[in-house]
A protein has these predicted regions:
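C-terminal catalytic domains of large/alpha subunits in multi-subunit enzymes
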Residues: 1-27, 31-35, 74-283
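Conserved beta-alpha junction segments in alpha/beta enzyme cores
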Residues: 27-60, 66
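Conserved short loop/turn motifs at secondary-structure junctions
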Residues: 61-62, 117
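Conserved strand-to-helix beginnings and helix N-cap segments that scaffold or border functional pockets
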Residues: 69-70
C-alpha cells in the first residue's frame, strides 16, 4: 500500500507540506487500524448429504449482501470435492438450524465458514465409518471425490454413493467453532489532503489503502467492499455533529441533510487486499 501510494516520495516530514500550488498546501498522512471481532463467539453448522448426492447446509447465518451464503457453498463443495451447484443453503431459521451468534461484526465468513468446513469434514468421517460397516473396509482407507467413494489402497476400487446411502437415506455432519479473540484484520490507509490557506477549504485529492484479509473467499466482493468504504470520508470532511456543551444533546436540526459527494467528485482511490494465514483453520 505504501508503494502504491508513493509514500517515500511524498512524505517530507511532519508539519511540512509535500507540495504547494498557490494558496493550496498539500500534505500526506496515514492511519492504521485493526478489527478484532471476526472470530469471537460460537458458531454451529449442520451439513447433510442425501443418497442422490445433494448437500444441504443448515445455518442461521443471514445473507445481507456480502455473498456469505455462496461462500459457505464454496467451502463445503471444496471440502467434499463436489461441484458447487450440488450444494444448497437452508433459509436462516433459528427454529431449524443450530444455535449461532449470527451474522454480526464481520464474523460470518470466518466463524461460520470454519464451522461449515468442520461440519463437512464430520460428514465425510461419518460416511467413511458407514462404508466400513457396510463394505468391511476400514474407514481410514476411504476418500470421497466427485460424489464417489474411492479406496486409497486400491484406486481402481470405486463405489457409488447409493451403495452406502440407500435411497432415500441421508447422512449428516456437525461443525462447531468455539470462537477466538485474536483473529484480527489489519488495515492501513494513505491519503493526500489539500488545504486552501485562504478559504480553509479541505479536499481529499488521493487515497490508497491496504488490508490483510486472511483467506479471500470472494475476491471481487472483497475488493468492492474495501473501495466502497471511501464514502465514509465524508463523515470527517462534510458532516458535523453539534453537541450542547452542557447536557451533550445533539443540536443538529436533523440527520438527513448531510452533503454527500457525487461519484464525479470522488478523488482517485484504490485498495489492495492481501492474503495471510493468520487464524486459518488447520485442524
Amino acid at each position: 500500500a505504501a508503494e502504491g501510494f508513493r509514500w517515500k516520495d511524498r512524505f517530507k516530514g511532519w508539519g511540512i507540506p509535500s507540495r504547494a500550488d498557490g494558496s493550496r498546501r498539500y500534505g500526506v498522512g496515514m492511519g492504521l487500524s485493526g478489527h478484532s471481532d471476526i472470530g469471537g463467539m460460537a458458531s454451529n453448522t449442520n451439513v447433510t448429504m442425501t443418497s442422490a448426492g445433494g448437500v444441504m447446509i443448515q445455518t442461521v447465518m443471514t445473507e445481507f449482501g456480502s455473498g456469505v451464503r455462496d461462500v459457505y457453498r464454496k467451502i463445503v463443495a471444496e471440502e467434499l470435492c463436489i461441484p458447487v451447484d450440488r450444494v444448497r443453503v437452508s433459509i436462516s431459521d433459528t427454529s431449524a438450524a443450530p444455535l449461532d451468534f449470527g451474522s454480526i461484526a464481520s464474523r460470518s465468513t470466518y466463524s461460520g465458514g470454519i464451522s461449515a468446513q468442520r461440519a463437512a469434514r464430520d460428514l465425510k468421517k461419518n460416511l467413511f465409518q458407514l462404508a466400513e460397516e457396510r463394505l468391511g473396509i476400514p474407514a481410514s482407507d476411504w476418500d470421497f471425490k466427485d460424489g464417489m467413494l474411492k479406496r486409497l489402497s486400491n484406486p481402481e476400487e470405486v463405489h457409488d454413493l447409493h451403495e452406502i446411502l440407500i435411497y432415500p437415506d441421508s447422512l449428516s455432519g456437525t461443525g462447531h467453532w468455539p470462537g477466538i479473540d485474536n483473529a484480527t484484520i489489519m488495515h492501513v490507509q494513505f491519503v493526500e489532503v489539500a488545504v486552501d490557506t485562504e478559504t480553509g477549504l479541505i479536499e481529499i485529492t488521493d487515497h490508497f489503502g491496504g488490508s490483510d484479509a486472511g483467506t479471500i473467499m470472494n475476491p471481487r466482493a472483497a475488493y468492492n467492499q474495501m473501495t466502497s468504504f471511501f464514502a465514509g470520508l465524508d463523515v470527517a470532511i462534510r458532516e458535523e455533529t453539534v453537541w450542547d456543551k452542557w447536557d451533550n444533546k445533539v443540536l443538529n436540526p436533523n440527520l438527513i441533510e448531510y452533503k454527500a459527494r457525487t461519484f464525479n467528485e470522488a478523488p482517485p482511490h484504490d485498495h489492495v487486499c492481501l492474503e495471510s494465514t493468520k487464524g486459518r483453520e488447520s485442524d
